Design a protein with these regions (language model features):
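Hydrophobic beta-strand positions that form the internal "hydrophobic ladder"
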Residues: 47-50, 98-101, 145, 241, ...
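A flexible loop/linker signature enriched in serine peptidases of the S9 family
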Residues: 54-66, 83-90, 104-114, 122, ...
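Non-catalytic accessory segments flanking enzyme active sites
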Residues: 40-42, 146-148, 170, 174-213, ...
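Short substrate-entry loop that stabilizes the transition state in hydrolases
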Residues: 450-455, 460-500
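Short loop/turn segments that connect beta-strands within beta-propeller blades
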Residues: 72-75, 117-121, 202-205, 264-268, ...
């Protein structure tokens, strides 16, 4: 974002507050957790109406969530609240006739599907099922619904699964029994239940016995832990469901071979549509007329950060091709135009998440909108509706024409709260990193920046490692919170980061401690030379996951660069890490195989092998429910420092996983982190 654009946004926010309002204060964690959160947006099929959810947090920290309706045909329209029940309505969809909406809510103790007429009245339960519905999708004609519920594959009906869950809860024994991996995933021990798909007719009758179209298959769809209903769809004729899943096998922990499967809506034989590809296939998406199936496909088995290719299958001729094979970006979503000739996609791009138009016949790619981080909601009537956030915008809905013109803000869910918040000015920069290649990053000035002063640095290192600290607004690692606390913030997208071409992403493979370390050193030297208000001699570095690994790597390989370090969920010993993490495909690809077959590379970049160089004060943070990087990694680093007299503190959250999600815990996290940094930077 250009500097002038940022300043304009800040001025506009300031003008919005009333004359009696308090002066804006530097952003703090209390303000972060109290921001309203927009979610669950949907656009009607005729493009005239928008429904979205807003979670509102009051000054006492109490939260409520409701749905709002906005008339898109009237530029002066104000949103109308259409729900007021306790709890949260989410996963909104419009009916085929646009007269009602569907959503999920837990109004009777379990998550069920509801329908609400938009001309008034109360929401009516569409389902009465003994298990939670975790997601759903409507057929194109609106006459069917596919739902995902967690069941036991051997059970013939939902009551059987309900009884099994109850028996587990009431069992007097606590032992968990396993015969193959995975035994736990992300933050949950496996209980042998699976996400399955159920289809039912929407005919005005309450759904009580949907058809399990994935019956007897010991597989997960949508895949855990983060996939949703973007991995499931009806064929446009309503005769089949297509979904992404792994085949049942004993190699679940070390394969990324997700395929697209097609099954009749009545159940029966399942057809593997992508059997030839042994890498990841994802997000089946049909053109409205059913002729084309588009989906995303990787080509490298076992590599979760491979570039997603856009594949297009002609269901009439049976021919398939890659669309835009020379486009060096990895799409994260697919949406067909009404005529099926264009795909609208989002992809990380130079620190942004941008929206692109892709011609399906010729493969031409054209950027439509490339400021901030954007997720596409719908394409209708030559308008793209999307959610946008940035380093100074928590998230609202916008529209833009398919030509990328007439950007219009549709919601302003934090108008009053943002009027009282002062953000730091930010700018993207670049420098010559490893191999003299261009590397990008961001700096942010302290919110109360004064010309001529120098400020301590918060050097944020992202995780992944195939990830990015870009132009987005995070609910966890929010760079503006350090700016609000008086720090100059620096973030570098080192070699291995995403959004800069696949070769750049791939370059970190088998070189975890090499190119990234060189980039981070050169990035610090470059930005402090360019921006003299940054105090190069008074900096603390922070990182989570791979970023936490890098804090441990700094200790052994760059131990004179920082006054302090903060290591959140960082890897300490690559040998033990390999044997206790859950998704084995990740370390096996990153380090060229299993530990026993490739010890040399695992040990080359193993922080524990360099502990004799450790001396920088470090705060270690870990969640006990972190099964990606189990908490023993953090405990081991802390133990070494304590035993060897290195200033160190440990913060453990028994109820958190790899991320800090509880809002009270998040406030404790920031209190400890900023307190630790203030201590060592003498701020």
């Amino acid at each position: 974002m250009k500097k002038s654009t940022v300043l304009f946004a800040l001025v506009a926010a300031g003008m919005a507050r009333s004359a009696l309002a308090a002066e804006p204060t530097p952003f703090n964690v209390q303000q972060l957790v109290n921001l309203n959160k927009l979610h669950s947006a949907a656009v009607s099929n005729d493009g005239k109406s928008l429904v979205y959810g807003v979670k509102v947090v009051d000054d006492q920290g109490e939260a409520s969530s409701d749905l709002y309706l906005l008339d898109l045909t009237n530029k002066n329209a104000q949103p109308k609240q259409i729900t007021a029940a306790a709890g949260t309505e989410h996963d909104v969809s419009f009916s085929a006739d646009n007269k009602s909406i569907y959503f999920l809510a837990s109004r009777t103790g379990s998550s069920q599907l509801y329908q609400l007429a938009l001309n008034g009245g109360e929401a009516m339960a569409v389902t009465d099922l003994p298990l939670d519905i975790n997601g759903y999708k409507l057929s194109q004609d609106g006459k069917q619904v596919v739902m995902t519920m967690r069941v036991f594959p051997e059970c013939k009906d939902l009551a059987c699964s309900k009884d099994k869950f109850t028996a587990i809860d009431e069992s007097k024994t606590s032992g968990r029994e396993y015969k193959q991996l995975m035994v736990r995933h992300w933050d949950t021990w496996e209980d042998h239940a699976r996400n399955h798909l159920f289809v039912a007719q929407l005919n005005g009758k309450k759904i009580t016995e949907p058809t399990n179209v994935t019956a007897n298959r010991d597989t997960e769809t949508p895949p855990k832990p983060f996939s949703g209903m973007e991995e499931v769809t009806f064929t446009p004729d309503g005769k089949h469901v297509v979904y992404s899943a792994k085949a049942p096998s004993r190699d679940q922990a070390w394969t990324t071979n997700y395929d697209l499967w097609q099954v009749p809506v009545t159940g029966g034989e399942t057809l593997n549509l992508t059997e030839a590809n042994t890498a990841w296939d994802s997000q089946p998406t049909f053109s409205a007329d059913g002729r084309y199936l588009a989906y995303l496909a990787m080509t490298k088995p076992g590599y979760e950060a491979d570039r997603y290719r856009i594949m297009l299958r002609d269901n009439v001729t049976g021919q398939e091709k890659e669309v835009a094979p020379l486009w060096d970006r990895s799409p994260s979503s697919l949406t067909f135009s009404a005529d099926g000739r264009t795909l609208y996609v989002t992809a990380q791009d130079l620190g942004q998440v941008s929206i692109f138009e892709v011609n399906t016949q010729f493969g031409d790619v054209r950027p439509i909108y490339n400021q901030g981080s954007n997720s596409l909601i719908a394409v209708t009537n030559n308008q793209l509706i999307f959610k946008k956030s940035s380093l100074v915008e928590p998230g609202d809905l916008f529209s833009v024409t398919s030509e990328g013109e007439q950007l219009t803000q549709l919601t302003d869910v934090n108008k009053d709260k943002l009027a009282n918040i002062k953000f730091g000015e930010y700018e993207q920069f670049n420098f010559k990193g490893w191999n003299d290649e261009t590397v990008h990053g961001y700096w942010i000035k302290p919110a109360n920046y004064v010309e001529g002063k120098q400020y301590p640095i918060a050097y944020l290192v992202h995780g992944g490692p195939q990830g990015s600290f870009g132009n987005s607004f995070s609910g966890r690692w929010n760079a503006q919170l350090w700016a609000g606390a008086g720090y100059g913030v620096v973030m570098v997208d080192f070699h291995g980061s995403t959004g800069y071409g696949q070769a750049f992403t791939d370059s970190i493979g088998k070189d975890w401690g090499g190119k990234p370390l060189e980039d981070l050193k050169k990035g610090m030297a470059s930005v402090t030379a360019q921006q003299p208000w940054l105090d190069a001699n008074n900096a603390c570095a922070l990182g989570g996951s791979y970023g936490g690994y890098m804090m441990n790597w700094f200790q052994g390989n760059w131990n004179d660069g920082f006054q302090c370090l903060v290591n959140h969920a960082g890897l300490f010993d690559m040998r033990s890490m390999y044997y206790v993490t859950e998704e084995l495909w990740f370390p096996e690809y990153e380090f060229g195989g299993t530990y026993d077959k490739n010890k040399e590379l695992f040990e080359k970049f193993n922080p524990v092998n360099y502990v004799e160089n450790w001396k920088t004060p470090m705060l270690v943070i870990h969640g006990e429910k972190d099964y990606r990087v189990p908490y023993g990694q953090g405990l081991a680093a802390y133990t070494y420092m304590q035993r060897n007299g290195i200033p160190s503190e440990l913060l453990v959250f028994p109820d958190e996983n790899h991320w800090i999600l509880n809002q009270d815990n998040l406030q404790q996290w920031y209190k400890n982190v900023l307190g630790w940094m203030d201590r060592w930077t003498a701020k």
